[in-house]
């Protein structure tokens, strides 16, 4: 059977923990955060050429705050039988480039996880299934939509609150298919507690992700034009 997850999907013994530097990053934090209008980013998730689900991020403004709603839906079938399901719901609140709060729930093939992050002064309070405590307030969650994550040495799990130690290596520009067109994208390799590759376009927007599942199969995120309505609703 196949078990995988790019950080949100990281579990000891079942996953190749996956699910994110240069002056070029200085202006890329604007990416999705500073696009302004309500908008969405949508990925089809593929395993070895088979579509197994989706990952969607919806961005909206409320005054000075940016809200990011995230939904992941995955299902793996074998001989018409579902052998794996994964559902993740997450809401982030940002202001001025700082994470104020994040709350997520996950059903990882029947195993439940949750995490609540809240800004407390210069720190971030973490209350998760696998970790509870305080961390520096500039620590980013493993939701990957900010290219700024590629400067991080530590990330906090958006699934269960664990702290991941990572090393990120920039690998240069490549052509990547994003929403039906080829774009130049910066490629990064993330290794350590997480093991995956990510790509960001000239505006700093996340456009691709790949990693190997524990069975050796290739999992790939392909960015596509978003459907009008999030499947399954917000789930918050």
Each PLM stretch: what is its role?
Residues 31-121, 127-130, 135-236:
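Acidic, serine/threonine-rich low-complexity disordered tracts
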